[in-house]
């Protein structure tokens, strides 16, 4: 994944999430916008972006801790395929995750996802 941007810009990307579970769901895939965040350990999908019929389960560590304190979270019960959509419409090699789901302002692709995509953040 190669991306160049100005420092003032937020690194937002279009993402396709595909539920790989075997149970029936209304939507197998959804498109969202997510922030690339090298400061986040894990990928967190906003409850607003998460389809209501995609199952979640209690997480072993049920809180996300950050600057603002702790936020309750759950984990996807199914493995989710995460694909970043390039500006030309092509799709990066997708990866499989069990993302966290929480009431956050926007979805975040954390280091687990960035590493899986082979993305390296540098300053030129």
UniProtKB/Swiss-Prot annotation:
UniProt keyword terms in alphabetical order: Aspartyl protease, Hydrolase, Protease
Signal sequence extent: none
Active site, per annotation: 37
Protein name: Proteinase p15
GO biological process, one term: proteolysis
Further facts: This protein is synthesized as a Gag-Pol polyprotein.
Subunit: The protease is active as a homodimer.
Gene that this polypeptide is encoded by: gag
Disulfide bonding pattern of the chain: none
EC number: 3.4.23.-
InterPro entries, per database record: Aspartic_peptidase_AS, HERV-K_Pro_peptidase_A2, Peptidase_A2_cat, Peptidase_aspartic_dom_sf, Retropepsin-like_cat_dom, Retropepsins
Record flagged with keyword Protease: yes
Segments forming domain Peptidase A2: 32-113
CDD domains named among the record's database cross-references: HIV_retropepsin_like (cd05482)
Functional note: Specifically liberates the five major structural proteins from the common gag precursor, as well as reverse transcriptase and integrase from the gag-pol precursor.
Molecular function terms from GO: aspartic-type endopeptidase activity
């Amino acid at each position: 994944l190669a991306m160049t941007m100005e420092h003032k810009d937020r690194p937002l990307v279009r993402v396709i999430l595909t539920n790989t579970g075997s149970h029936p769901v209304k939507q197998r895939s959804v498109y969202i916008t997510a922030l690339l965040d090298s400061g986040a350990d894990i990928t967190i999908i906003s409850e607003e972006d998460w389809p209501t019929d995609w199952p979640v389960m209690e997480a072993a560590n049920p809180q996300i801790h950050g600057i603002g304190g702790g936020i309750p979270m759950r984990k996807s019960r199914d493995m989710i395929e995460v694909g970043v959509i390039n500006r030309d419409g092509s799709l990066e090699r997708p990866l499989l995750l069990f993302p966290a789901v929480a009431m956050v302002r926007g979805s975040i692709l954390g280091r687990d996802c960035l590493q899986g995509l082979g993305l390296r953040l540098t300053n030129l």
